[in-house]
């Protein structure tokens, strides 16, 4: 049997053994937020690395906004393409109630930065045919959106000795936000994106062992061979680790199974989040 260095070794016929971090007190912790819808307006827009529209939003509704997790997601509601109107649900004691037949287009986004008062920054990945990308390309100062959330955050300690991040372009903003706070002895990034664009976007990669895996195609569950091969070469510790996986939904599931089943990692310290789904 070929043994890949890793979190644990699972041999046939034996009880699976997970080698946990020093204690579960080191596990990421969830916090909840009260759900609110907030009206925000475009304050400025800049193209970044020829791959993202960075839009700074402002508004008094941002008072009390809280985003404690580096990969939090907020729901961004876009105006009706025909009428320009924003239709929102009602928040009741029983939850969210939508008006019959009215459901605006919405997408999930990770807050890149918030000044704690009234300025929120989002990066919109530029691609063809995307509702959010198209809106961002046309956005002008004063244009209005509505956001909801984040309803909850996963607060991940910044000082795990070993940290490994896998993402495509859609996950780069979350990694950029995370990178500013990381204190790790070993930090790996495996990014399914063009190296030049990735480096231009992330800028400071000091202390990061970066692997770029762009093949000109989107991350899919059936084309992960080069990524898995690269991961096989990375020796994983038995404690003090954190692994973050994001990208296309089915691909993320394959990667999650790779770490928790093939490499024997503790699922408490493997964070797998689908950022988009192949239709």
Residue ranges and their predicted role:
Residues 2-7, 13-279:
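Extended, composition-driven regions rather than compact fold-specific motifs
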């Amino acid at each position: 049997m070929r043994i890949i260095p890793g979190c644990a070794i699972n041999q046939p016929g034996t009880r699976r053994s997970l080698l946990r971090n020093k204690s579960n007190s080191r596990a990421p912790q969830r916090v909840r937020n009260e759900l609110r819808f907030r009206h925000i307006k475009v304050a400025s827009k800049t193209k970044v690395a020829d791959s993202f529209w960075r839009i700074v939003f402002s508004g008094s509704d941002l008072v009390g906004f809280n985003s404690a997790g580096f990969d939090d997601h907020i729901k961004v509601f876009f105006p009706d393409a025909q009428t320009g109107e924003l239709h929102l649900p009602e928040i009741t004691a029983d939850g969210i109630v939508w008006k019959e037949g009215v459901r605006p287009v919405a997408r999930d986004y990770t807050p890149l930065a918030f000044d704690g008062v009234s300025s929120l920054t989002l990066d919109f990945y530029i691609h063809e045919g995307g509702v959010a990308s198209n809106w961002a390309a046309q956005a002008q100062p004063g244009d209005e959106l509505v956001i909801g959330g984040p309803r909850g955050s996963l607060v991940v300690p910044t000082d795990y000795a070993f940290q490994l991040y896998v993402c495509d372009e859609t996950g780069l903003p979350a990694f950029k936000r995370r990178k500013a706070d990381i204190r790790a002895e070993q930090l790996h990034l495996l990014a399914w994106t063009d190296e030049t664009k990735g480096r231009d976007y992330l800028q400071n990669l000091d202390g990061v062992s970066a692997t770029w895996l762009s093949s000109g195609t989107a991350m899919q569950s059936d084309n992960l061979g080069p990524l898995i091969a690269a991961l096989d070469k990375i020796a994983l510790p038995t404690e003090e680790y954190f692994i973050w996986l994001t990208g296309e939904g089915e691909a993320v599931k394959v990667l999650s199974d790779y770490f928790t089943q093939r490499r024997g990692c503790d699922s408490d310290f493997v964070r797998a989040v689908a950022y988009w789904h192949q239709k």
